[in-house]
Each structure stands twice: as structure tokens, then as C-alpha cells.
Amino acid sequence: MTELKAKGPRAPHVAGGPPSPEVGSPLLCRPAAGPFQGSQTSDTLPEVSATPISLDGLLFPRPCQGQDPLDEKTQDQQSLSDVEGAYSRAEATRGTGGSSSRPPEKDSGLLDSVLDTLLAPSGPGQSQPSPPACEVTSSWCLFGPELPEDPPAAPATQRVLSPLMSRSGGKAGDSSGTAAAHKVLPRGLSPSRQLLLPASGSPHWSGAPVKPSPQPAAVEVEEEDGSESEDSAGPLLKGKPRALGGAAAGGGAAAVPPGAAAGGVALVPKEDSRFSAPRVALVEQDAPMAPGRSPLATTTMDFTHVPILPLNHALLAARTRQLLEEESYDGGAGAASAFAPPRSSPSASSTPVAVGDFPDCAYPPDAHPKDDAYPLYGDFQPPALKIKEEEEGAEVSARSPRSYLVAGANPAAFPDFPLGPPPPLPPRAPPSRPGEAAVTAAPAGASVSSASSSGSTLECILYKAEGAPPQQGPFAPPPCKAQGAGGCLLPRDGLPSTSTSASAAAAGAAPALYPALGLNGLPQLGYQAAVLKEGLQQVYPPYLNYLRPDSEASQSPQYSFESLPQKICLICGDEASGCHYGVLTCGSCKVFFKRAMEGQHNYLCAGRNDCIVDKIRRKNCPACRLRKCCQAGMVLGGRKFKKFNKVRVMRALDAVALPQPVGIPNESQALSQRFTFSPGQDIQLIPPLINLLVSIEPDVIYAGHDNSKPDTSSSLLTSLNQLGERQLLSVVKWSKLLPGFRNLHIDDQITLIQYSWMSLMVFGLGWRSYKHVSGQMLYFAPDLILNEQRMKESSFYSLCLTMWQIPQEFVKLQVSQEEFLCMKVLLLLNTIPLEGLRSQTQFEEMRSSYIRELIKAIGLRQKGVVSSSQRFYQLTKLLDNLHDLVKQLHLYCLNTFIQSRALSVEFPEMMSEVIAAQLPKILAGMVKPLLFHKK
């Protein structure tokens, strides 16, 4: 293609003479029939007909009627007289077709003088191109909510998507024709629409003739040094909906800077390396509201004090899932690749598309939302943030920035919504990952200007679209999916979890939001009891899999100490046929265990003695299957006890899992004696649960505070945030080893960690202060201990007094380590969503099991029913009081987080995500605390 030079549409007129209305005032010509006007017949455009409206008419503007499409190749070489002649010939041509041009207005001279002043060349020999006036000055809706009042009267042309601009070989800084070779963009278009040129076959405006190319090409953007290469951009739209991220996704018209490329070329602005795509542009406050625009389009938001962070709890869920389910990722959680690949269409080209330039969830002109349903499982993955499992205090390798999506944000639902530029990030700690920002969807007129903003306002800002129900209609599909498609969360269900394939099939193409589960009286979800991931120590399965029968569904299971196990095999997860050899098993595992024990088989594992034993793979490795049978407590002597009543089954399984050190009734004592092994047998029972809790307790964590420097408010808060980040990672690792926790659904695991992390941290602070300094000081870490003097000098003295109450209660009650460990697990299970959890039944049974363990821990020191009951009341009352105490910490933490930039306080990344995603929910009362006693 020959190099084309961009030439301004206005030529200099004769000095002293009046400006030519034909050339000097393109704004005075009649706008051509747009996509919302009636159709007209033209000889030059025989393909135009009165057909139903399509997206082509919305995307590609019609040029002025005063321009001829036949003189494109010679426009840049014409003189002033040639242009005037072409204009008159075009008028004649249009006249023969039945169309007439609009005569100049009576105030054309005034407009000419204004245009001469505003559109004067910026320098000698340079001229700024002025686009035709027929270009629409308001932003267009790419998705369809801004349809005309009379759709049948709107013309449409079914064309192939016109070629997009491509960058020439030279650099942006060259002014000798290379930069001028760029296509001049119309000024009236919003930056996101400037990436599209008129369709092939349609007349172009005289600013820059364009030669169509046979294949659509991706728009390439001028980047800073070190950005992605040109070959990283592939086809933009090919069979799958995609949106143009470009310079602005907000729909506002961006002003052309004076320092633009030579010839007035205004391409997509350069991206700041600190922020991730999609790029956004400012919307001026005094810009008039365009017709068809909603009031949101001109609302200027104040995001100065709102940190730009990933505000989607689904993103945090993906991050935490990487820690909780790292074994199930087949090499997909590398240190350098911490993001899932951008979603791609199954029919799209394999050429990678620049992630920052082309966000997801846009529809091509020739497609309808309902025709592009995402498959349930495919090669696409929603943008998900993953965490690398790292040692505390280790440096995280820097990565290139990527974009976040706001929870529930749907471009179809908010077509005109202006997105302001990302404000500066709050100071980040050194180990946090740099260069990440989030696009925040805020309601009209909402702003956060001070720390005194109410929780409801913050909740509205952070969660405007998150909890909204899916909107019905052709242009408002549920977030990140088209109508008739499976939810975006369904691929997440493909990860190994405790849910059976039957429940996944029952969900089918369920909506993206999981159905709400009540606390009581609702159907139970499918459940694979014995499927544990690789690397998880398979211990204590009998206690973890107690399920309530349907007959007890109406009763409150919160403090039920006796419940009948559901008939699920504790070895392979199949339906159990009864209690065989002391354990609820299926017939297959019963026969296998009998033959293995009586036949004296010497099974050897071909792997690492950690094979998964479930209904499908139970026959793969007999060695691991037999080992699991022995760990569950199966013995040949137990076959005499098949018929148990409810109490006997419970006590028998308790005796198998945990031999009770205190006095027990004679009946269960006889049962426990029958479940013991002779010393000659080479079979080891699992240790008691309390001993296991002691073994998985995290090591000492340091804050990294420099005590040689004087304490300042910012330094103390930053050190506490660094300590909180490391403790949060430690909580995730600890919960992975917690017996029974991995049996819950993966989403329930993430939710419980998000809701209880603050309670666990302050509870651990109280225990360390009680054990190391007898409750006289706050023992945050070995290198960060605050005495009363340092508390008074800090800016959060009242908060320190609040936290100081916990170690003082420990001193008063003389809490033992066994009691503390059981109470710590109950704190993890103390707050749930209002609608319940996905694996609600398993959660209730796990919580009941640890309540029983707390009673056993109390029985180690307290003898007698009365003293044990009083002790249980005191400890559970302390757990209930922690809810109000932690709520004060949540409020202070969120206020500090909002003002972190003004206070110079650094918030690490993972902690920032939890704060931004969950604290507004908790403070707004959108969670349900589980209390032992009524207030």
C-alpha cells in the first residue's frame, strides 16, 4: 500500500477574503441521514435499503453529503480550487439522487470566524485537521440499550467489518510522513469508537483516505518502551464477542493534546506502566449531556480517596483457591504466570490478543447476545487472580500488569457509564506485587471524601453490581455470560471438590450465582466423603463425615451433639450398606477389607502411598485402599456390631477416632475396648484430634518492624499490616491441614477464611500476650511488642485497649492450650453468609464435632458435670463477645484503608483484597454470626 499523507480538510484561504463556507466551515453542512433517520436512495450507494436496524449503523457514521466517495485517491493532492470543484460536483451528484444539501445558516460568518480562531494551525506549516460535523459528537452504545425511537425507519447496511487501523513502520515521534501516515481520527468520536473506521464501501471524510484491506486487523497502540510487540495483537472480532478497550472505555470524548503526533494524529494515549488496562479517559464536568445518554454519563466521580484495588470477592476467591487447591492445578500456578489466560472464543484465532487493549464481554456487530452462549467447559477462563504459595517474608517476582473485572459488572447493563482515570494507588509494601489497578463501578453521585463515610455508602460503592439479580432482556445478560449459557462460575466447579457429579449435573446451566442454601430444612448437596487431595494428610475421616438424616432437618443442628451418620461409605464415598467392621462402608469396601485381612496380602503402592480412593478409582491401588480402611478404624472384630442404635453408632465412632481419656459409661467403654488393636498388629490409629491441632499450629511469625527507629503512626500501622499479610497466608496454610475443612466446598472454604481472618488474628494476639507476657502487654510478634506506654503514644490507643481485653480474659479464665486450639477452630466456623453455605450440612457436622472436642478439652481439667458446664459457658461466652470486639477492628481497618494514601500507610496486596471485598459486607450486616448464647 502506498504511503498516504494526512492532510487537513481546510486549506488556507486568500488573505483578506471571506472564508469559504464550503471548505472553511464543514460544521455548517447538513448532517447525513444517520442510523436513526429514514432511508434514502442514492446512486452511489446501491446497497443501502430499508432493512431492520443492525449494529453497523450504530458503529459506523455516515459522512457529510457534501463529500464524494469517488475522489478518495486524489483528495490529498487537490488545491483549494480542486476541493471547491469537487464539492460542487458532489452537490450535483447528490442532487440527481434526490437529496439536497442544506443551505448555509445565516450566522455562517460568525461560525467561520469562530472556527478560524479555534481551528487555527498550531505552528507554521502545520494545520490541525477538523473532522466533518456530521460525525456524532456523543458516544455511541456498542451494546444496544440506546436504540432509536422508531427502529423500522432506521436504515442498515449488512457489511463486513471494515479494516481497522494499523501502525506504520516508523515511530510515533517521526514527523516526516511516517507519523502522518496514521489515519486522522474524527474528533467527535469517543476514544473507544475512534478505533473503528467507516465500513468498506462507504465514503470516508476528506481528512484521511483509507484503502480497505481484505482482513480485519487489530488496532495497535503506541506503547512505552518495553511494551508488547506488534505481533501480540491478533484479530479483534472473529466469531466471539469482544469489546474495544482502547484509550477509553467510558464513552467520553477525549481532548486531543497539543503535543500529539505530527499532522494532528491522535491515537490511543500511552499507558502508564503503573496501571493496568483497560484504559480510561477523563470526562469533563462541563461537557453537555449528549442526546440518548443517561445521567451517569456526565457524572464526575471523586475517586481521590478510594484505593484502586481488586474489589471483586470472586477474584480473591480465585487467589485463595490457588492456595487451597494448588495440587489440582497441572502446572498452571507457576511463579511467573499468576494470572489465568484471557478468555478466548473456541472459534477465535489462536493469535493472542493484547489483554490490556481488548477487554472481554463485547458483542460483534453481526452477532446477538443469545447466539454466543459460552460453553460450560472450554478453553476460556475468566480473568482470575491467583496467589503463589510463598514463604513468609519472601520477595514476590514482579509481573506485567493485568486487568481486573468488577464483580457483576456488565458492559451491556451500563453502556454509557463513564470511567474516570485510575487514581494513584495507596503506598504498597515491598513484597506486594506492583502495577495493579481495578476498574471501579460506582453509582451516580456517590463519592468517598472522608473516613466518616457510612458503611452503606461504602457498600454501595464497592458492591453496586455484585449482589444485583441478573437482568432479563436481550441486552442485559447475567455478568460475563450470554443468555442461555452456563454461568462463569461453572468452570470453577470443575475443580476437584466434595460435590458429586450428580449435583453438578443437577445445576446444569444454573445461573452464575449459587442458589441460596438456608441453615435448616433444605435439601442436602451431593458429597464425596472420602475424596481428599494429594498432599493432604488423610486423618480422622470418621469424625469429618457425620451427616444429618432428613428426619432431623427441621431441628436446629447448631448444638446437636448426637446425630446419625448418613449412609455414605467412609472409604470410597459410595452409598454405604451398613456398619461393617466398625465403620460405615459400602459392600465393595467391606468385601475388600475382609479378603485383604484374611488373605494376608502384601500390597505395595506403585506411587507415593497417597493415591486417591473414591468410587471410581478405589480399585486402582489396593495398598492405599487397605491403608485407608485401617485409618478409618476397620477391624475384623467389629463385624459383630452391625446393628447399632443412634447413640451407640455415635459413641462407637468416637471411640474409634478418639479414645477418651476421661471416664466414660460402661457401654461405650466396652465398645472402645473391642475397637483396640493388639500390639502385634502393624496398624497405627490416627492420633487424637487435639494432638493433631497442636501439631499443625503455625510457627512464630515476625512483623519485620525496625525498633531502632522512633515509632510513628504510619510505621506502626504499616508493620501491623505486614504482619497481618503474613498471618493471613499462615491462616490459609493452617486451614488446609485442618481436619474436615477440606471436605467443605471450595467456595465455602474461601468464604469462611474471608469472614474470620480478623477474629483469628486478634485471638492469636491474645493467646501470645497471655503466654509470653502474662497479658501485661500486646505481643503482636517477637519484634513488635507494645507496652502501655507505646500504646498511649500510638494513634490507635483506644483500639489497643479493646484488643487488650482478650489476654486479660485469658488470664482470668486460665485457658489451656487444648481449649484455645478448639476455640480457634470454632472462630473459623463462627460466621457464615446469610443464605448459608454450599456444603451447609458438612459444615454443621464439622462445627458440632469441634464443639464436642471443646467439651473433651474442658473435661481434661474440670471434673464433674457442674464445673464442666460452667467452664463451657464461660468459654463460649468469650467467643460470642469477640463478634462485637472484632467489629470495631473491622471499622477501624476499613477507615484506615480508605485513607491509606493520606496517612502514608501501606497495605499489602492480599490483605487489601480481603478488606475491600468483605469488610463492607460484614459491616453492612450481610453475614450471619453464629452465637452460642442469646443476647
Swiss-Prot record:
Record-listed cross-link Glycyl lysine isopeptide (Lys-Gly) (interchain with G-Cter in ubiquitin), residues: 388
Modified positions (Phosphoserine) in chain numbering: 20, 81, 130, 162, 190, 213, 294, 345, 400, 678
Region (Mediates transcriptional transrepression): 165-305
Residues of the signal peptide: none
MF terms (GO), sorted A to Z: nuclear steroid receptor activity; sequence-specific DNA binding; steroid binding; zinc ion binding
Gene3D superfamilies: Erythroid Transcription Factor GATA-1, subunit A, Retinoid X Receptor
Binding site for progesterone: 768
PTM field: Phosphorylated on multiple serine sites. Several of these sites are hormone-dependent. Phosphorylation on Ser-294 is highly hormone-dependent and modulates ubiquitination and sumoylation on Lys-388. Phosphorylation on Ser-345 also requires induction by hormone. Basal phosphorylation on Ser-81, Ser-162, Ser-190 and Ser-400 is increased in response to progesterone and can be phosphorylated in vitro by the CDK2-A1 complex. Increased levels of phosphorylation on Ser-400 also in the presence of EGF, heregulin, IGF, PMA and FBS. Sumoylation is hormone-dependent and represses transcriptional activity. Sumoylation on all three sites is enhanced by PIAS3. Desumoylated by SENP1. Sumoylation on Lys-388, the main site of sumoylation, is repressed by ubiquitination on the same site, and modulated by phosphorylation at Ser-294.
SUPFAM superfamilies: Glucocorticoid receptor-like (DNA-binding domain), Nuclear receptor ligand-binding domain
CDD domains for this protein: NR_DBD_GR_PR, NR_LBD_PR
Domain of life assignment: Eukaryota
Residue ranges, annotated region (Disordered): 1-256, 328-353, 415-452
AF1: annotated span: 456-548
Region (AF2): 689-935
Placement of covalent cross-link Glycyl lysine isopeptide (Lys-Gly) (interchain with G-Cter in SUMO): 388, 533
Annotated region of DNA binding: 569-641
Keyword Nucleus recorded: yes
Main location as per UniProt: nucleus
Subcellular location(s) per record: Nucleus; Cytoplasm
Family note: Belongs to the nuclear hormone receptor family.
Domain writeup: Composed of three domains: a modulating N-terminal domain, a DNA-binding domain and a C-terminal ligand-binding domain.
Subunit composition and interactions: Interacts with SMARD1 and UNC45A. Interacts with CUEDC2; the interaction promotes ubiquitination, decreases sumoylation, and represses transcriptional activity. Interacts with PIAS3; the interaction promotes sumoylation of PR in a hormone-dependent manner, inhibits DNA-binding, and alters nuclear export. Interacts with SP1; the interaction requires ligand-induced phosphorylation on Ser-345 by ERK1/2-MAPK. Interacts with PRMT2. Interacts with NCOA2 and NCOA1. Interacts with KLF9. Interacts with GTF2B.
Official protein name in the record: Progesterone receptor
Protein species of origin: Macaca sylvanus (Barbary macaque)
Gene that encodes it: PGR
